[in-house]
């Protein structure tokens, strides 16, 4: 089987770590992909992503802790574990320490200078490296710890110093290349897809299969036409369609084409339920397999979905069985427990509110208009009180929309979702657009809605908060540039227990310099990988010379910021790329400005 030296991948990774411009990142990836045999391009894509396989597959993690890693390095370099720990402490990076220790150990063995040895080829290839890492992950049960150490030590022993650094960083989960899926798709389009004009074909395939390695392999080996044939597959999560937001019923109906389905927006966990015969899979909006958390939903889905094969989407919400009252999203956290799930079912019972159908008995429904999808959904669901269709109306009247919204708020939900129902109202997997619009208001704030922002840095607290983190640097996602742009520094809204948990939450993501995908002019005390998402509210959107969100779009040398930002809650159900986008904040700011101007004109007339 065709293969490629690991050295080529490692050299590319090193180059990628030194640049931030997307054009350069794409150029380096294109060069790498051109050298990669189609048979192994899936493995190359996974390794660039820093994974062995997509998370949704539910495969084991590597399971190598720091002590095991140190033991493997000591065996590979034929030195004591204490020496490994000492070097890692001096350098502050166990990957770089491994590189140095390999250079020293192997130059002694060969008599070559350190520089000369770094140039020596090794026998490691992408395939044997990937396969060994898979063996490490799959080693389970009695004796697995020693087996993992031996396998990793053997891999490091055969590696060059630079390859060893790469392997250690991969095992640590700290392969911080700064490349998002969007950048990889750009490179695939240029290399195999006939140019960026065919990028939408690649993106749709990825949004339906949620596996960039698989998409790359089909594209590289069979071409763009084969990729166009991809459709949903039961058991493989589809990336969820996302909504824009507005706070004016008239504007909402204009955007949806004059008419819409308007449905309750429940404060629960978005879930994609797959059925194939007597098998059920449930995936979260982050594509995590959450089937084990909801055995009660599995039972209902098997009984109530009247189809051999189907993919439906809805919201899982905790409720009070005595009063029927719907509970907030946070209550679902109790379902995350791995033990006593039956007890959790009794204490935190759930209802399922379905709102879409994506696949039915071999037929792709994502390309059908919403009314067709909804009609088919109604036909296959045997509705009960705890497994039903989301409450909705069809309207072209803004007053009726507002009345339904107020009714929804009164019934304890977050707001409503307005969804276009014209002939082009397809299900846009993985896309945020105007076919779906959130209408949701926080009456305690001048801001029309909360926003979801990504943590990119942290500041140490003062006074009562001394000795721990007191504030976080938050960023929005710029989809066009595939970067995160700072919006605000948030230090209020946190409970003491929130602040107490911050060090442990941030520890896996702390880095010694700004992440390549973060655009910031403000310097926090600690930089953080853009991973954690939080819901934020504020008094209003404003312009700031120190924040980079949509900088220069509204006003030269000024970005969009939030005045008096306040932490609401963590959003573990959202990926960083699901955060509020820079373009959304531009639209929110412009609507806010329009509202203020209108109110001022009214006051002047009075």
UniProtKB/Swiss-Prot annotation:
Keywords: ATP-binding, Cell cycle, Cell division, DNA damage, DNA recombination, DNA repair, DNA replication, GTP-binding, Ligase, Magnesium, Manganese, Metal-binding, Nucleotide-binding. Other divalent cations such as Zn(2+), Ni(2+), Ca(2+) and Co(2+) are not able to activate the enzyme. Its EC number is 6.5.1.7. CDD domains: Adenylation_DNA_ligase_Arch_LigB, OBF_DNA_ligase_I. ATP binds at residues 263, 270, 285, 315, 355, 432, 438. GO terms for biological process: cell division; DNA biosynthetic process; DNA recombination; DNA repair; lagging strand elongation. The active site is at residue 265. It catalyses: ATP + (deoxyribonucleotide)n-3'-hydroxyl + 5'-phospho-(deoxyribonucleotide)m = (deoxyribonucleotide)n+m + AMP + diphosphate; ADP + (deoxyribonucleotide)n-3'-hydroxyl + 5'-phospho-(deoxyribonucleotide)m = (deoxyribonucleotide)n+m + AMP + phosphate; GTP + (deoxyribonucleotide)n-3'-hydroxyl + 5'-phospho-(deoxyribonucleotide)m = (deoxyribonucleotide)n+m + GMP + diphosphate. Pfam families: DNA_ligase_A_C (PF04679), DNA_ligase_A_M (PF01068), DNA_ligase_A_N (PF04675). GO terms for molecular function: ATP binding; DNA binding; DNA ligase (ATP) activity; GTP binding; metal ion binding. Optimum temperature is 75 degrees Celsius. Activity declines drastically at temperatures from 75 to 80 degrees Celsius. Its cofactor is Mg(2+); Mn(2+). Optimum pH is 7.0. PANTHER family: DNA LIGASE 1, DNA LIGASE 1/3 FAMILY MEMBER. NCBIfam families: dnl1. HAMAP family: DNA_ligase. Belongs to the ATP-dependent DNA ligase family. DNA ligase that seals nicks in double-stranded DNA during DNA replication, DNA recombination and DNA repair. Can use ATP, ADP and GTP, but not CTP, TTP or NAD(+). This is DNA ligase. It comes from Sulfophobococcus zilligii.
